């Protein structure tokens, strides 16, 4: 499917918005979904082995935990809405997730030796991810970065298996 023109560059037409949304959803959004969830499962799996089931309290900065507690309260006040999950890792932004990885890189490096490269990749991904998630139109370079990191992320879970770590969904 050829990329449609960014609808924001033309006179408003709802059909252009629909075309853009379908294209971006099919082209990239699902890859972000997979990529972020693989990273969350990877971090949870490794830190569960290294620090135990309650790794969240031991391995995550207090400010991040406070932000998560605030978000949990917001969700609990609207129980009819979708819930991100029970574990705090589902409530953190990509930037906070990257901070958790950075602080715990000494544990993660045992399984993913190139974790420092991943820290840079995740930081590079934040703006393209937010552009797409906030319903804006990413440039081709950003879409290509999402594609590249999605492909690279496929190699992360086999690293768990190689180290005899079962993937643990938070």
Predicted segments with their positions:
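Amphipathic alpha-helical interface elements
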Residues: 1-170
